[in-house]
Amino acid sequence: MALNLRKNHPLLKIINNSLVDLPTPSNISAWWNFGSLLGLCLITQIITGLLLAMHYTADTSLAFTSVAHTCRNVQFGWLIRNLHANGASFFFICIYLHIGRGIYYGSYLNKETWNIGVILLLTLMATAFVGYVLPWGQMSFWGATVITNLFSAIPYIGQTLVEWLWGGFSVDNPTLTRFFAFHFLLPFVIAGLTLVHLTFLHETGSNNPLGIPSDCDKIPFHPYYSIKDLLGFALMLIPFIALALFSPNLLGDPENFTPANPLATPPHIKPEWYFLFAYAILRSIPNKLGGVLALAASVLILFLMPLLHVSKQRSMTFRPLSQILFWILVADLLILTWVGSQPVEHPFIIIGQLASFTYFAIILILFPIVSALENKMLKL
């Protein structure tokens, strides 16, 4: 009998064990689609980014015009840029939904997979931040100035660190060139980390909506979930293409149509929508170092999720109190996102402070208390 190449070839068998014969729980829902959607986003971003890099010039005097040139004179340059800019938004939508799924269904108990995932989120945030600086518009320049300046809050070494990061005494040409280098490099780091993420995931297998072991009821990934992933791809690509073609600048800042000017500060400096929740937490603390620590904690708190799990059940499927708390957390993040886009004045300051407090309180205090209460109510 001839050997099956798919199962025996050194390279093909790796792909086979990851995408074809992978034993998968039979009951995973559409919430398990976001992993593959993130893979699709990453591939799209790397391809469009590579095409943009071919026409981009990382120099303060040429960056803005090189981007304008790409949009005006390069064949489909406008489309490539719009796909790349809006692809970032869809990347973050998918990763936030993916993390939300992980919290709801207790997927964070696969500790290695979860920790690599949080590192992936941090790398993605770094990539998006340095990428936003590259067009060298007003918001690019001032966003870079404000965010890099946060490092100066670190005691003793802060100022030196910031000047080392800038490559001078302000955000200037050296900053732009190194940010371009980072923006080119980091997506490949993300791709490498993704493989590690999947390697750890395939050690334990996927979790499922019931949060119970599913070894007794596994089905092959292909054709069942490969076709389901294709449906997910179509459902994401439709709004993505629609956004990129009909209103490509909807999520951008109009300030970025003005070339960077170190002598004129925009009236409201704010990051892209996907960073607004963290920006609101940063602004809600009147002390610089405190704000920076809260900003870091807002994302790093995810590392604590496995340690804060006290429930005897893995998933929230049969835990109505935890579910209510989870959806309050989601609403709270939406409020923080909205507050982050508003100016720093009376109602927004206090709303931001309350929402920031609620965010940390739910994750650090209320989730464990409510989980313990549910254990008691169910006599577990």
From Swiss-Prot:
Binding site for heme b b562: H84, H183
Disulfide bond sites: none
GO cellular component: mitochondrial inner membrane; respiratory chain complex III
GO molecular function annotations of the record: metal ion binding; ubiquinol-cytochrome-c reductase activity
Segments traversing the membrane: 34-54, 78-99, 114-134, 179-199, 227-247, 289-309, 321-341, 348-368
Domain of life: Eukaryota
PROSITE patterns named among the record's database cross-references: CYTB_CTER (PS51003), CYTB_NTER (PS51002)
Alphabetized Gene3D superfamilies for the sequence: Cytochrome Bc1 Complex, Chain C (1.20.810.10)
Additional facts recorded: Heme 1 (or BL or b562) is low-potential and absorbs at about 562 nm, and heme 2 (or BH or b566) is high-potential and absorbs at about 566 nm.
Subunit structure: The cytochrome bc1 complex contains 11 subunits: 3 respiratory subunits (MT-CYB, CYC1 and UQCRFS1), 2 core proteins (UQCRC1 and UQCRC2) and 6 low-molecular weight proteins (UQCRH/QCR6, UQCRB/QCR7, UQCRQ/QCR8, UQCR10/QCR9, UQCR11/QCR10 and a cleavage product of UQCRFS1). This cytochrome bc1 complex then forms a dimer.
Its job: Component of the ubiquinol-cytochrome c reductase complex (complex III or cytochrome b-c1 complex) that is part of the mitochondrial respiratory chain. The b-c1 complex mediates electron transfer from ubiquinol to cytochrome c. Contributes to the generation of a proton gradient across the mitochondrial membrane that is then used for ATP synthesis.
Protein name: Cytochrome b
Originating organism: Corvus brachyrhynchos
